[in-house]
Amino acid sequence: MSPHPRNIKLLFALILLLLVYIARQKRFEQQYFDRYLEHPRGGDSTKSKFQTEVDKWVKCMEKDLYVDRESWYYVRFATERCKNASIFLNVPIMKLETNVEYQTGIRSYDMFIATKKEPFVFVTIGNYTDSRTRKNMTDELPTDLKTYGTHLNSSNIYWDYGSLANYLNQSESAGIGHFSTYLKTQVNHKVIDLISIKEEVNNYKIFHEISRMGKLDENGQIVCQIEIRLAPPTSQTIKHLMAGLSLIFNDSRYVLLSFHNLELFLVNYEHQECRGKYLAPYI
């Protein structure tokens, strides 16, 4: 006996309701997860749990900066202490020691947060990482890795490296533009997962370029992780370095998770594209 048409309609209606329920449940779970990141359980619901931790970190760093604003050395120790005093302690930073000596007897590191999530856009500036370390690094990253660089051996493109190197090496008085111009013209991606600058940076206006309302914002580009190697500051440039670091601490965009000798490692917590991929899984 064939099923009654009314029963068939009822069956289809039940299936439709089930599909709607599943879709709404997935949406609810995602909203709950987002709300968990944005709001603490109990307490002041006007401030997110995440922002509370960020504020704690900023206050810690600023307190240490004001101890001695003429000496950047203390910032290195403060970076580790303030990270350990916040939820960012849970974020696993990979530090791969290279065969390259940054200074006599001091090894350079490649620093990044590993992921297998695609897409992954990797920009290298400067050719200071040995091939063994670079292979170990890429083994921790997605197979479909898109790499852009400023030297022939690093990627599928080559740009006027001399121009960019001159910009990074020039003093504070140098005009800005080359760093953001390179990213805009040669890296055709809105989200850049990792930038590794192995050229010694002496132009601290790079901090303004990556900060809010900076040149990267004008480009419409987002950088999730950035490793910057600094040139040793002088008595004339130290105040500019401290001003750049202070801007980063108060800009509500990057958290400084490592300061190894003169190599900084910053992670973007402002944009969801970065926070959800590199910070949220560990918080």
UniProtKB/Swiss-Prot annotation:
It comes from the Eukaryota. PANTHER family: METHYLTRANSFERASE FKBM DOMAIN-CONTAINING PROTEIN (PTHR22989:SF4), UNCHARACTERIZED DUF13 C.ELEGANS (PTHR22989). This is Uncharacterized protein C28H8.7. It comes from Caenorhabditis elegans.
